[in-house]
Regions:
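Alpha-helical transmembrane segments in inner-membrane proteins
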Residues: 1-240
Length: 241
């Protein structure tokens, strides 16, 4: 009962903080608008200031919130799979694999610049698959996966550094993809992210119980009739998506 109350209180505090930060972000810049003015401009009567804020700031703020939620959930799931509270996508080599793909496309096929996010995603998938392949010895031991991921991450990071030296000024385009930013994002970008993020978050909800089980010893999980390696592969696949 106490645990449920704590969760409710934590949820309410977090929700209130999110609303406050949203309002602060909306009013960060040369244009200012009170919450009352924003609500009135959105639902009652046209307001040029509110319309500008809605077109420029709203999509960026919502993209940042949605991306943050997706990254947070994937991070928690990765920590559950790896049984390590310090685990992150960098350990799995996902981030560096995606960055390496972005660098290669920008360097050798600049005409495909608009498709760089797609290639970055494929690079992350490739890196994750490489970690699976190199760490597989009849099963997926979290320790082997982490050690292999560190090695793969170091390898791709080294290649990215070499690419940066070779590309010079042209590297900035790839870096913007690798590092991520919300500059010049529009409602179209938000709609695109919304589809993938919501699908991933909904699937994550159904996998919460599986992630809790992965905290047990593998032998215990097997005794429950659960194929632990299959569950790990499913959760890890969702994480890098």
């Amino acid at each position: 009962m106490i645990s449920i109350k704590r969760k409710i209180i934590s949820f309410l505090i977090t929700g209130a903080a999110l609303i406050v930060l949203f309002l602060v972000a909306v009013n960060t810049g040369s244009l200012k608008a009170s919450p009352e003015q924003i609500l009135r401009g959105l639902f009652v009567v046209y307001d040029e200031t509110v319309a500008t804020i809605y077109s420029l700031r709203f999509p960026r703020i919502l993209i940042a919130m949605l991306a943050g939620a997706a990254v947070a959930v994937s991070g928690v799931m990765l920590q559950a799979v790896m049984k390590n509270p310090l685990a992150d996508p960098g350990i799995m080599g996902i981030s560096s694999g995606a960055g390496m793909a972005a660098v290669l496309v920008t360097a050798f096929a600049p005409s495909l610049y608009l498709a760089v996010p797609v290639f970055a995603f494929l690079g992350g998938v490739f890196a994750c698959g490489l970690v699976y392949l190199l760490s597989w010895e009849g099963d997926l031991s979290p320790l082997r996966v982490i050690l292999t991921g560190v090695a793969v991450n170091a390898f791709f990071t080294g290649l990215m550094s070499a690419g940066e030296s070779m590309m010079g000024a042209n590297y900035s385009g790839a870096a913007s993809i690798v590092n991520g930013n919300i500059t010049m994002k529009t409602w179209e970008d938000f709609r695109m992210l919304f589809i993938y993020a919501v699908i991933g978050l909904v699937l994550a909800v159904f996998l919460v119980s599986k992630c809790d089980i992965l905290g047990l010893e593998d032998q215990t999980i097997h005794s429950l009739g659960i194929r632990v390696n299959v569950v790990r592969l499913i959760v890890l696949s969702l994480i890098h998506i």
